[in-house]
């Protein structure tokens, strides 16, 4: 078998191989059908054989054949099968090969169509030039490029279509002899290297008349073409044919009109060219914004060209009608945002496919947006300013205007009008040359889209312009970009990069984070002009529309009628709003006066301000930067005066610095930038200690300067690195994750004197201050400043204790506080300066930096500068702080100038107008805001001593009333009594003079409030802890208890305070109602309550809020941020200048709501409600005690630490939330029942599921006994509520954190007003609070309103956010604030009179 198998199979295999040979050469035999038939037969044979063998394989296996033989057989069969498969494949390929691929097959592309296709692919046309230079052939598509027809060019000279300047080159290359030589070279050189020439070819004009009438430029239009020249093909020449030598050229456009995929849309037109249809699908699908605008503008531009121009849409369609297609040259237009768009339209004639009649045109418009990002537009040297020669300062004549090139920039040519105003928004072209020698002047700001160019040299409105020779002095690096950093579009530095930009006349901060620029400038050792004084206000309210910060420039005993005037206080706001009061003639006059004074002030204070500005810039929130370009830059005219009174070299600086308050949500990137700047400082050789010192100096130096300003010896307080941990600030800034911290915002890295070069925007503006500063200003040694620092520490302690800035280091140690609080000092507390100063010069509202005038209370940096007033220093008794707070309120409004107090005169508390110096009005205001009155009213502790917070009336309060002052005094007395009592009972009250907790602690906008901040003060935070927004529920004014019990500046103090509070709580808890009443009587609370009620009735709606007054005041400070709406818009400070849109109470509330939402500490801004003080005192005490316990118990209690980023836990036990005594508790219980019912009804009425919010079980307040909850837990819970609810909901009554605000409505006073069942706190938590029963009038309604503003908090205390779904209801049901304002029949809940007035 084996033999048989071998002999039989092998021959078959051999035969198959032989037969396969033809297959191996498919090119030959396969052509014939016979070969094909033979192959098919072979395939069949092989297939049959394979099947036969495979069928017998099983039998073969049984044969007695050696295994190797079987394997061979199997392998043979496998090969046969492969051959069969290959045969099938080859046979299937034969047909294709024969038809299409074989050399005999027909070509795929017709030769006639190949040429045009190639030309189309090349995007060019072909022409052939003979040795005489004549065109012997040109392709038909030349019409698309040169508008010439084929017959127009054939047999014409190629030179006729070449641009004259290029003809010579062409002639030199292609003259006959050279052409021949060239062609000869082409024969010898590689054909792959064609000769390439760029030429401009003439395009045909459309009609003779146009040629005759138009100018040569119009008649002759050229298209730049790239020519690829080749000699005649060698093959043609070698064939011996007598062909004339010629050159073949392909000309193509140099660059395609739209290299990248352009946007496009299609329009259909009738034969007359009218638009019939617009197809936007392609544009819409591109997902690019503003496609409607681009279509509208493109069509408008397309149809706008007239026949008199090189082309028109009419001619375009005529050409399309004749030729069937046409295309326009590239044309351009700009979009609304200034983006330049290049467009080209190609049209085709549309015919009816059946009748071939012309029906119309289809036009495709190709659009290409040009990259118009920040492209520095070199300023023509003949225009604007030329870069100064190296070494020369740029002296710009006042008349030199740099017009901003930015698409949106508005050049203000009039130097008198513009000048240094360039405040944040005025991107006066910082283009003013950078002062640094050799640096060419770049005016990136000129490109700032939003910046408004002010003439660089023009003096600030109110301030005398710098003489050309002076201009170098005032340059603040901040205005300029840091030298190496191109100024950001919105960067204040928009102008020259050099740190010392020309006297910051250009306030080009347009909207950039000047802080970064300043830091960079510092890190880079940018200019050293301290004159520019970095006082550029880092945080400028500028952005906050309403925040006017009036700063009495002239601190020394002068009543600055317009703080602006004195301070030149063109508030940064002014610059941003263009409202600066300084613009007013009075302001100018005042600024001039102050400028006279400026010379008196030493340069040090100014420098310190500059540093503060830097620190502020560094730390200011992104929002602040973005909105308020930090400050008026040197442009601020105010700067001048400010130097005197405020000491901020740039008068504005302090004012501006105070203002940066816009809240920005873009913190991460800013924070990173800040970190980079700090790291750069370190890398540049600055030790951490030096950096810390710089920042400390920046923030704290000026404090005392104001006070001494009158003396003409303003001292800069420099935080002594010795006193502070040098690295503390730096570490804090680098480690801090919450860019929203107000403190951080305020802490502006201020360069040390060297760094002050950066002088933030405010510095350079004041020529006078700058000039005078130079020689006179000197920084005092740390030792010299220590006294001031102590004062400042006292104030800073308060600030730190406030949620503003938790600084564990603040400890009790003033130095540490200052360093930690460099920011606070920037807050405006420079040095407390003897708090008792006769008349606290009000800080320029804006300038947190401005030092307090002599004898003035430490100027609290206007928190207003910070978003929100959270900061408002509650330095009790510090009128300045109060002022700033009010300024906050005033500034909060979109119009900073609008007086915040609806009732008060501008001079009054609210002076919304920065110009109205609070100081003056104070003198006359019933509240006696005058410094003297203030002093009297506010017991001012010695330096560092804390003054019990005087509940200042919020700007919003209807009118300053003398009675309020009395109440304040009474409250202060009560506070003191309580302190004594507490000390006696628990020795709890360990008031650290520097530690008065500032209610302002919460970042105005930081939801986390300070809670996010590494909680130096978990407890201090409590006082501020209102809620993310600074405990909206808490009275804006800090409760006196809070002041007394104010969280210590350091963690240690906090723990001590907690222990004391726990003890006190235990004591009070164990005390029966009778004992509590005795304590109340001992404190004089009953009388205060009675008075408070009377006052409340007087207070209008405010009084109802009086407990809320604290809140209201804060609100005032916060201004009607929302008025009714809760959206906590920082920028939306509803024209704080404006009176609250709703009732003042509501306005306040809304303000509070908004700011609290901002994470501001309600308390921060407010002093305390005057009328509610008694209630507040006692309730606060209880609340704080219970609150702490509750916080421990409550899941919502956010550890009382600033840590809580959300600030939900912001409410801290410290918060004076309504506290109920036993009687009140009983009343509350009764009320709870009714309120629960009412709430349920409310819930049913409201679109949102309020039942949950109000259902007793959910409501912590409801389910737990009201008193228990209210007393302790309610407050802590409130915080969670704050942010959960919509901003507007905050306005809603339902949220009404009855406890928020620390108004402690539950106090006896509250209960008396509320009535047994109307405990405001209880009610507020309940939906019914929205429409509190008329019984609740007075206090409750006020509370309600406030609650509306801070509903989250107030409810939050209840502890169940859901419980306060009412607040959420606000969002669904509309603004609760509005509801509160309009008495709605809520389950029979009559609104209190106060509310009714809302």
Curated annotation (Swiss-Prot):
It is found in: Cytoplasm; Nucleus. A motif (LXXLL motif 3) lies at residues 1041-1045. SUPFAM superfamilies: HLH, helix-loop-helix DNA-binding domain (SSF47459), Nuclear receptor coactivator interlocking domain (SSF69125), PYP-like sensor domain (PAS domain) (SSF55785). It is an enzyme of class 2 (transferase). Residues 111-181 form the PAS domain. Keywords: Acetylation, Activator, Acyltransferase, Cytoplasm, Methylation, Nucleus, Phosphoprotein, Repeat, Transcription, Transcription regulation, Transferase. It catalyses: L-lysyl-[protein] + acetyl-CoA = N(6)-acetyl-L-lysyl-[protein] + CoA + H(+). PANTHER family: NUCLEAR RECEPTOR COACTIVATOR, NUCLEAR RECEPTOR COACTIVATOR 3. This is Nuclear receptor coactivator 3. It comes from Mus musculus.
């Amino acid at each position: 078998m084996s033999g048989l198998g071998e002999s039989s199979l092998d021959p078959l295999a051999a035969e198959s191989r032989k037969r396969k040979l033809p297959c191996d050469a498919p090119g030959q035999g396969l052509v014939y059908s016979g070969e094909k038939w033979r192959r098919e037969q072979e395939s069949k044979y092989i297939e049959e054989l394979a099947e036969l063998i495979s069928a017998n394989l099983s039998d073969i296996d049984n044969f007695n054949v050696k295994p190797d033989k079987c394997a061979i057989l199997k392998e043979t069969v496998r090969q046969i099968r492969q051959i069969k498969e290959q045969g099938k494949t080859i046979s299937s390929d034969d047909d294709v090969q024969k038809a299409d691929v074989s050399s005999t097959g027909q070509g795929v592309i017709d030769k006639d169509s190949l040429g045009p296709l190639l030309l189309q692919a090349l995007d060019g046309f072909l022409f052939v030039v003979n040795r005489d230079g004549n065109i012997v052939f040109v392709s038909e598509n030349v019409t698309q490029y040169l508008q010439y027809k084929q017959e127009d060019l054939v047999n014409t000279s190629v030179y006729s279509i070449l641009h004259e300047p290029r003809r010579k080159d062409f002639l030199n290359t292609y003259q006959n002899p050279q052409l021949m030589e060239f062609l000869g070279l082409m024969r010898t050189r590689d054909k792959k290297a064609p000769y390439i020439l760029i030429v401009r070819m003439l395009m045909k004009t459309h009609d003779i008349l146009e040629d005759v009438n138009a100018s040569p430029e119009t008649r002759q239009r050229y298209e730049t073409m790239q020519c690829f020249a080749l000699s005649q093909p060698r093959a043609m020449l070698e064939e011996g044919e007598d062909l004339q030598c010629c050159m073949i050229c392909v000309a193509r456009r140099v660059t395609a009109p739209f290299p990248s995929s352009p946007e496009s849309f299609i329009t259909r037109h009738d034969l007359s060219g009218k638009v019939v249809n617009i197809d936007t699908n392609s544009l819409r699908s591109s997902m690019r914004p503003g496609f409607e605008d681009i279509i509208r503008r493109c069509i408008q531009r397309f149809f706008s060209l007239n026949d008199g121009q090189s082309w028109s849409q009419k001619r375009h369609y005529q050409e399309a009608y004749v030729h069937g297609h046409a295309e326009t040259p590239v044309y351009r237009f700009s979009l609304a945002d200034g983006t330049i768009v290049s467009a080209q339209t190609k049209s085709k004639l549309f015919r009816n496919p059946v009748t071939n009649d012309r029906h119309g045109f289809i036009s495709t418009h190709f659009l290409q947006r040009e990259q118009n990002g920040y492209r520095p537009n070199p300023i023509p040297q003949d225009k604007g300013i030329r870069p100064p020669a190296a070494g020369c300062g740029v002296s710009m004549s006042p008349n030199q205007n740099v017009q901003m090139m930015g698409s949106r920039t508005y050049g203000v040519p009039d130097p008198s009008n513009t000048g240094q105003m360039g405040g944040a928004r005025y991107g006066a072209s910082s283009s003013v040359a950078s002062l640094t020698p050799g640096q060419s002047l770049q005016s990136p700001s000129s490109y700032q889209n939003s910046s408004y160019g002010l003439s660089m040299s023009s003096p600030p409105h109110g301030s005398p312009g710098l003489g050309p020779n002076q201009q170098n002095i005032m340059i603040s690096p901040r205005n300029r970009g840091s030298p190496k950093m191109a100024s950001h579009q919105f960067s204040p530095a928009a102008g020259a990069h050099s740190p010392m930009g020309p006297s910051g006349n250009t306030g080009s901060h347009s909207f950039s984070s000047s802080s970064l620029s300043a830091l960079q400038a510092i890190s880079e050792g940018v200019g050293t002009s301290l004159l520019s004084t970095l006082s550029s206000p880092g945080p400028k309210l500028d952005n906050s529309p309403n925040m006017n910060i009036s700063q009495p420039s002239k601190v020394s005993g002068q009543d600055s009628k317009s703080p602006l005037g004195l301070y030149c206080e063109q508030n940064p706001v002014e610059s941003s709003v263009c409202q600066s009061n300084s613009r007013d003639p009075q302001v100018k006059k005042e600024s001039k006066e102050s400028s006279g004074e400026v010379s008196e002030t030493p340069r040090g204070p100014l420098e310190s301000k500059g540093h503060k500005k830097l620190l502020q810039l560094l730390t200011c929130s992104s929002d602040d930067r973005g909105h308020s370009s930090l400050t008026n830059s040197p442009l601020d005219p105010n700067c001048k005066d400010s130097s005197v009174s405020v000491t901020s070299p740039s008068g504005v600086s302090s004012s501006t610095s105070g203002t940066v308050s816009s809240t920005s949500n873009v913190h991460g990137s800013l924070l990173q930038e800040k970190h980079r700047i700090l790291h750069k400082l370190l890398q540049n050789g600055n030790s951490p200690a030096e950096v810390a010192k710089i920042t400390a100096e920046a923030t704290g130096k000026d404090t005392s300067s104001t006070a001494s300003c009158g003396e003409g010896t303003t001292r800069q307080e420099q935080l002594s690195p010795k006193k502070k941990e040098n690295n503390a600030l730096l570490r804090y800034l680098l480690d801090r994750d919450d860019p929203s911290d107000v403190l951080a915002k305020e802490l502006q890295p201020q360069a040390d004197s060297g760094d002050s070069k950066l002088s933030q925007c405010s510095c350079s503006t004041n020529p006078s201050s700058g000039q005078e500063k130079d020689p006179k200003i000197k920084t005092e040694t740390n030792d010299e400043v220590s006294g001031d620092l102590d004062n400042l520490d006292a104030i800073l302690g308060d600030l730190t204790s406030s949620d503003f800035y938790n600084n564990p280091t603040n400890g009790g140690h003033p130095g540490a506080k200052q360093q930690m609080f460099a920011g606070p000092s920037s807050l405006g507390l420079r040095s407390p300066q003897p708090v008792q100063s006769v008349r606290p010069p009000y800080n320029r509202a804006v300038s947190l930096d401005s030092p307090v005038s002599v004898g003035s209370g430490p100027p609290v940096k206007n928190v207003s500068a910070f978003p929100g007033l959270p900061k408002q220093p509650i330095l009790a008794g510090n009128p300045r702080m109060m002022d700033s707070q009010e300024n906050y309120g005033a500034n909060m409004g979109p119009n900073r100038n609008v007086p915040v107090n609806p009732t008060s005169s501008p001079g009054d508390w609210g002076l919304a107008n920065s110009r109205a110096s609070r100081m003056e009005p104070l003198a006359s205001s019933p509240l006696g805001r005058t410094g003297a009155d203030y002093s009297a009213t506010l017991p001012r502790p010695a330096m560092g001593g804390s003054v019990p917070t005087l509940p200042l009336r919020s700007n919003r309060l209807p009118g300053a009333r003398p009675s309020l002052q009395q109440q304040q005094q009474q409250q202060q007395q009560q506070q003191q009594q309580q302190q004594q009592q507490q000390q006696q009972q628990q020795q709890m009250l360990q008031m650290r003079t520097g530690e008065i907790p500032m209610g302002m602690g919460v970042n105005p906008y930081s939801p986390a409030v300070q809670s996010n901040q590494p909680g130096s003060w978990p407890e201090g935070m409590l006082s501020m802890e209102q809620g993310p927004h600074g405990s909206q529920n808490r009275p804006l004014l800090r409760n006196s208890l809070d002041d007394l019990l104010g969280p210590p500046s350091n963690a240690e103090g906090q723990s001590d305070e907690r222990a004391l509070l726990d003890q006190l709580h235990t004591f009070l808890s164990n005390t029966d109602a009778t004992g509590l009443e005795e304590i109340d009587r001992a404190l004089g609370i009953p009388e205060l309550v009675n008075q408070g009620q009377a006052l409340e009735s007087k207070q209008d709606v405010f009084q109802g809020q009086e407990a809320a007054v604290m809140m209201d005041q804060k609100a005032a400070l916060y201004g009607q941020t929302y008025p009714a709406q809760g959206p906590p818009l920082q920028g939306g400070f509803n024209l704080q200048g404006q009176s609250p849109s709703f009732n003042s109470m509501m306005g306040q509330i809304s303000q509070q709501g908004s700011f609290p939402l901002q994470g501001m500490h309600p308390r921060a801004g407010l002093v305390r409600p005057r009328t509610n003080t008694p209630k507040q005192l006692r309730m606060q005490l209880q609340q704080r005690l219970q609150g702490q316990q509750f916080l421990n118990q409550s899941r919502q209690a956010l550890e009382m630490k600033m840590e809580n980023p959300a600030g939900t836990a912001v409410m801290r036990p410290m918060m004076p939330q309504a506290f109920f005594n036993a009687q009140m508790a009983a009343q509350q219980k009764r009320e709870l029942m009714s309120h629960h019912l009412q709430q349920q009804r409310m819930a049913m009425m409201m679109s949102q599921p309020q039942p949950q919010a109000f259902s007793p079980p959910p409501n912590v307040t409801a389910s737990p006994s009201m008193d228990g909850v209210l007393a302790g837990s309610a407050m802590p819970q409130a915080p969670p509520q704050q942010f959960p609810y919509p901003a507007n909901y905050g306005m809603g009554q339902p949220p009404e954190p009855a406890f928020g605000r620390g108004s402690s409505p539950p106090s006896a006073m509250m209960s008396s007003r509320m009535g047994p069942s109307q405990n405001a706190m209880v009610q507020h938590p309940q939906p019914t609070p929205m429409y509190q029963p008329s019984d609740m009038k007075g206090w409750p309604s006020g509370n309600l309103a406030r609650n509306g503003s801070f509903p989250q908090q107030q409810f939050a205390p209840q502890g169940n956010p859901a419980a306060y779904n009412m607040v959420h209801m606000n969002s669904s049901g509309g603004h609760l604030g509005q509801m509160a304002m309009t008495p709605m029949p809520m389950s029979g809940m009559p609104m209190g009179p106060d509310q009714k007035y809302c």
